[in-house]
């Protein structure tokens, strides 16, 4: 990984690409050196490249944007090809930042050059589905690779218990950081899973009364599940990238690359914890499966700093209130989630609406009141400060 590095900033200068360099190096070590390895898909076009990141976010990088990135980055080193690949990764990051911030590429690139937090650098490279918080003992373990924050918007690559940054090495002592989830091997007796209640991409016949919330604290997850079903269809195979089934349970790969294993006993536990009501048994079954997958991911990510203790604890963290957007992310849909407004949802755009008290599905200008659709216009939601989200 000595083929390239980020040049150190000068005194008084606001310039720092150490976080991006550290993340790119970790991706090279984990997935391979080529952008085609580090991203899900890279397709050359007449004017540049179409890029799909591992979380599903899509950007188009022009030759001119790549050239401007190369001129501005100050990546240095002996490996010209590695530097060129790092430039490509940085350009894609900046293009995503421009798309998410609704700004021009040059403005996004300028902002990028000023530095980035470790988490934002990882997220912007499409790694949200692979992120695992690493405590010092895991981050400093032999034969392990990670990244850690060193100062404000600076980061360092961690290899074999040492952080590498600014041409220096230092041992991991009390540092926390991030590592990428290991591959989960395919079970030899696995087969494609089947969910017979509805064909792939077909929306629920009655999203209101077919399944609705019965547990007071799990509204964020319930509204996210309903929103996903109204966007991609009721069948989990339309929401996730792929699902296989074996005698031991299910292996689920989400759209952002996160893979979880779910046992039959865990699925039963999720059914009890979800406490779903409704008139459509098949719809409830599919919603329970999504709920269980969300809880399993919460366990792997140690949601609320306690879900890692076990699946039962992870289920509890889904039932005690959450931050809007967390549940959509745990379904693998972070890259497809966008900010909206209560006015946009009231006009008919589907999504979720949340405040400090509750989170609801909104479809066709109506919000979900525990299984009953009610007109959003004129409701208390129009006058309360809330967070509106939509899927694209």
Question: Where are the regions a protein language model picked out?
Answer:
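Cross-family signature of deubiquitinases and ubiquitin-like deconjugating cysteine proteases
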Residues: 5, 9, 13, 21, ...
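Intrinsic low-complexity repeat tracts in disordered regions, enriched in small/polar residues
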Residues: 22-31, 53, 150, 158, ...
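N-terminal short leaders/motifs
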Residues: 1-12, 100-107, 190-213, 308-316
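Catalytic cysteine-centered active-site loop
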Residues: 33-38, 234-239, 327-336
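Predominantly the structural core of cysteine protease catalytic domains
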Residues: 16, 57-163, 211-212, 217, ...
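Active-site nucleophilic cysteine motif
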Residues: 13-26, 214-227
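Non-catalytic, low-structured ubiquitin/UBL-interacting segments
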Residues: 1-6, 161-206, 392
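Extracellular/luminal recognition modules and glycoprotein regions
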Residues: 6, 24-25, 29, 36-38, ...
